[in-house]
């Protein structure tokens, strides 16, 4: 295989800008798929990816294309996830390429996620060229979008390809540009093997399948390979390429992209970003850029029906096989029974995992409010990381608390700026800058505490801007904050599943909203139920659910007041006794209400 005829590229685009459809057109045009095999969004293998129109795992496909100069080229398309939670996966997929297509919707212009991924690509010196998609739409305005790309991203866009993936316009021009503009890979096939592992997933028959991009050396079937970060070694049982279905080959040489099946049992052993080398002839240094991905958002998952606990455990273990960035530990709650504390990269990641559990494994789950990782500095000087309110020590042992901050880039149309600024201020944000990108698009940059974002920030941002805003964020650092733990008590008993860690300024309002919401949801009992929100020993809000009572005076017509009083006193005594022994069943909705309180 002549290395000068190879091209490795990826497609960078915001959600819904037509990336997967464009990939379909490229597959069709180069004859990788016949009309019969063609299905929309071929590369998005999971139903959920297809349904939400997002790419979650990276996929690769090898296309052969005869260019106008008469030569045959091999093009490796590496499809990247386009969502903010999966930034690390994107950066590894991009590191496996020499160039990228920047796909921008000709009617919507540049969005926040596009920017984040383009900057990742430009940071590692990829050759990026723009493609304007959806030019068949009546609202398409290529002139404006070209100007936007040049002003915001700073790459030359005057000769951008105009295309419509849906109609198949411009596919040939895109392939020609890939051949002309993207440089061939560099690499020495005789050097020791150095390959980047940029994705892995679990197959129930063959174990873990890893995707690699070979930078130096050659990987043959039967070689013993070593993964440098985990120091584990395996035998390469099969090597090959996706064209777009799996095709086995004898070897993969420098510059090529392909898969390796090596009998690896768990995805945790094949970490994304790791360097693959040969055991008997290892390379001198690993490829740079590897990092351990740490969960940032935590939430408790409990089965509604306790019988499903075992099923939930098996389901989580299966998902973990495929997704090493997700973590789970068993935990118990007095109110909810047995469940798991799960860690996710971000909100979208959390939603996807929950949906997959409910859809693929048929589980009914209840989810506690998401929290982030706080740092507790104790009086003794030790620092402890906590991810749920129940782990927080008593206040007298705590010197101060720190919470994680993020830097958010929000793109909005001009008319919504006021509403978005008000939302960010309400969420304790610190304004960095406001940039007018064009006459009607604004980029707002804010520093925000992560725990304000995990609850409902994204939903509220979308509703304020009628769905036009796009958000991208990166993690900054930990900062000292006045955080407290708020407990919810029912008849004096603390309900552990409802405890929250939040900022002292917000505790009073949040507590008041919470107890009034709970009052609506808890059914009336035969005795009165007190619902209280407390910080330490101080009660900050209270509501009472009145008792149901029988009319004990119904049978007294007229008669003496003392007789009536005796009956009422007797009833009161009974209610008191009942309150001591009675316990309140909390309905399922009560926990969901916590998530919904604005």
Curated annotation (Swiss-Prot):
Its main location: membrane. It is an enzyme of class 3 (hydrolase). It comes from Pelobacter propionicus (strain DSM 2379 / NBRC 103807 / OttBd1). GO terms for molecular function: GTP binding; GTPase activity; ribosome binding; translation elongation factor activity. NCBIfam families: lepA (TIGR01393), small_GTP (TIGR00231). Required for accurate and efficient protein synthesis under certain stress conditions. May act as a fidelity factor of the translation reaction, by catalyzing a one-codon backward translocation of tRNAs on improperly translocated ribosomes. Back-translocation proceeds from a post-translocation (POST) complex to a pre-translocation (PRE) complex, thus giving elongation factor G a second chance to translocate the tRNAs correctly. Binds to ribosomes in a GTP-dependent manner. One of its GO terms (biological process) is positive regulation of translation. InterPro entries: EF-4, EFG_III/V, EFG_V-like, EFTu-like_2, G_TR_CS, LepA_C_sf, LepA_CTD, LepA_IV. This is Elongation factor 4. It is a peripheral membrane protein. The gene is lepA. It comes from the Bacteria.
């Amino acid at each position: 295989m002549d290395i000068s005829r190879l091209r490795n590229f990826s497609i960078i685009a915001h959600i819904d800008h037509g990336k997967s459809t464009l990939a379909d057109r490229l597959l069709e045009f180069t004859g990788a798929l016949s009309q019969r095999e063609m299905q929309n969004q071929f590369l998005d293998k999971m139903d959920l990816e297809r349904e939400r129109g997002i790419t979650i795992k990276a996929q690769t496909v090898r296309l052969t294309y005869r260019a106008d100069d008469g030569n045959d080229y091999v093009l490796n398309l590496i499809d990247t996830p386009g969502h903010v939670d999966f930034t690390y996966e994107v950066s590894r997929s991009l590191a496996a390429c020499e160039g990228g297509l920047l796909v921008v919707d000709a009617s919507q212009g540049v969005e926040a996620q596009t920017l984040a991924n383009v900057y990742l690509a430009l940071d590692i010196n990829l050759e990026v060229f723009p493609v304007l998609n959806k030019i068949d739409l009546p609202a398409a305005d290529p002139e404006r979008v070209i100007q936007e790309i040049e002003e915001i991203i700073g790459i030359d866009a005057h000769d951008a390809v105009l295309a419509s993936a849906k109609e198949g316009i411009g596919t040939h021009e895109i392939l020609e540009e890939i051949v002309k503009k993207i440089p061939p890979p560099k690499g020495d096939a005789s050097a020791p093997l150095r390959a980047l592992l940029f994705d892995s997933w679990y197959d129930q028959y063959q174990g873990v399948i890893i995707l690699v991009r070979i930078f130096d050396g050659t990987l043959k079937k039967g070689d013993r390979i070593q993964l440098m970060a985990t120091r584990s070694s395996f035998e390469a049982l099969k090597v090959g390429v996706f064209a777009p279905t799996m095709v086995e080959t004898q070897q993969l040489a420098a510059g090529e992209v392909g898969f390796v099946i090596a009998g690896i049992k768990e995805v945790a052993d094949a970490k994304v970003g790791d360097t693959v080398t040969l055991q008997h002839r290892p390379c001198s240094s690993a490829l740079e850029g590897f990092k351990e991905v740490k969960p940032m958002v935590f939430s408790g998952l409990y089965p509604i029906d306790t019988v499903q606990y075992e099923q939930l455990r098996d389901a989580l273990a299966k998902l973990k096989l495929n997704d090493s960035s997700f973590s789970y530990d068993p935990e118990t709650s007095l109110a909810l029974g047995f469940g798991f504390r799960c860690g996710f990269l971000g909100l979208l990641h959390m939603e996807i995992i929950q949906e997959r559990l409910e859809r693929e494994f048929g589980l009914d789950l209840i989810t506690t409010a998401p929290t982030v990782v706080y740092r507790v500095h104790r009086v003794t000087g030790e620092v402890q990381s906590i991810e749920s309110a129940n782990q927080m020590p008593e206040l007298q042992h705590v010197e101060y608390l720190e919470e994680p901050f993020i830097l958010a880039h929000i793109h909005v149309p001009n008319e919504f700026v006021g509403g978005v600024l008000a939302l960010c201020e309400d969420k304790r944000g610190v304004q960095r800058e406001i940039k007018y990108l064009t006459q009607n698009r604004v980029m707002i940059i804010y520093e925000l505490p992560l725990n304000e974002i995990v609850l409902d920030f994204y939903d509220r941002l979308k509703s304020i801007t009628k769905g036009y805003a796009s958000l991208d964020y990166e993690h900054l650092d930990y900062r000292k904050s006045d955080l407290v733990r708020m407990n919810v008590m029912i008849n004096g008993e603390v309900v552990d599943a409802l405890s929250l860690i939040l900022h002292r300024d917000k505790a009073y309002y949040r507590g008041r909203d919470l107890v009034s919401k709970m009052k609506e949801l808890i059914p009336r009992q035969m005795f009165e139920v007190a619902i209280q929100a407390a910080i330490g020993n101080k009660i900050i809000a209270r509501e009472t659910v009145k008792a149901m009572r029988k009319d004990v005076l119904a049978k007294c017509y007229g008669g003496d007041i003392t007789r009536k009083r005796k009956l009422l006193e007797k009833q009161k005594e009974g209610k008191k006794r009942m309150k001591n022994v009675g316990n309140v069943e909390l309905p399922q909705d009560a926990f969901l209400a916590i998530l919904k309180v604005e």
